[in-house]
Amino acid sequence: MSSRFPLYIIGIVLFASFFSCTDMVPTKEVRLIDSLNGKAYAYRYRSLDSSYKYANEAYRQVNFYKSGKAEASNNLGFCAFMAMDFDRAEALHKEVYKLTKNELELLIADIGLMKICQRTAMNKEFYDYRNSALKRMKRIREESDLFADRHEALRLDYAFTEFFIVSSIYYYYLQQRQEAITSLNRIPEDEALTDTNQLLYYHYIKGSASLVEATKPEDRKMREFDQLYITWRTAVQTNHPYFEGNGLQGLANLMVSPNNFELFRTRRGYALDQFGFPVDSLLPLRMAQRALEKFREYNDLYQIAGAYEIGRASCRERV
């Protein structure tokens, strides 16, 4: 009996090392799928093609790890959304409801569907998914100690930050500016700062949607500029062409007005020198052209159209 006991213990240890505690899924599979999904997320604002490749590989490689497949489906839904294939994006996010009972991935699916409804002006459905997301967030807060794994902790921070950013954008388009600012202010600063994707998104929305607070119109313009400049500079440093383009486009839009351009040339001349263009009346047009190059590199049809419009507006102002 005593000679068999150590063998019994060794057997348990080997079994535990082979299987994770996630629905008795092999540990090797969990690590592989989490790694692929992590790469899909890391590339989402760097290269949409690469993000899709890793998410699709994760989706196809799953045998038992259903919450990992749900995460891959959410990542694929993001890629479809950015490609403006809203029907496919909706189907992929809704597939998550069938794949898992993991509240975190279900929350991220709700938020993905909120984004689709906002973009396609489906207001009632937006609030349906938002209310569902709020209920899930409440349950997750009550059981936050369950998300101790580093991968899940990062997903948790992303989900909550994304919820408040998406809500803020929705309020902005409804011209409910104070509600939009309040939503952004609910993002814990440490959560936004730990995720470069969300940090860039946060600064970009604050600047492009003018969700900054100032008593004087001139000061408000300066704060918008500063948020967009931070977006551009950080995106260049971290190789995020999507936000590099958005930062440039937002700044070009601010400077389309000759009066605004003179204001920024006077008070932010040191920043304008960093773009590598002559600081003259054609600077907004050159910045819009560079933004267009970045959006083409990333293959973002929605922002490509916006860059063309800003370029045309800049030309009209100077005719």
Question: Residue spans of the language-model regions?
Answer:
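Bacterial N-terminal signal peptides that target proteins for export
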Residues: 1-9
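Short, intrinsically disordered/low-complexity patches at protein termini
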Residues: 5, 17, 267-269
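Bacterial N-terminal signal peptides
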Residues: 9-17
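A "functional boundary" signal
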Residues: 21-318
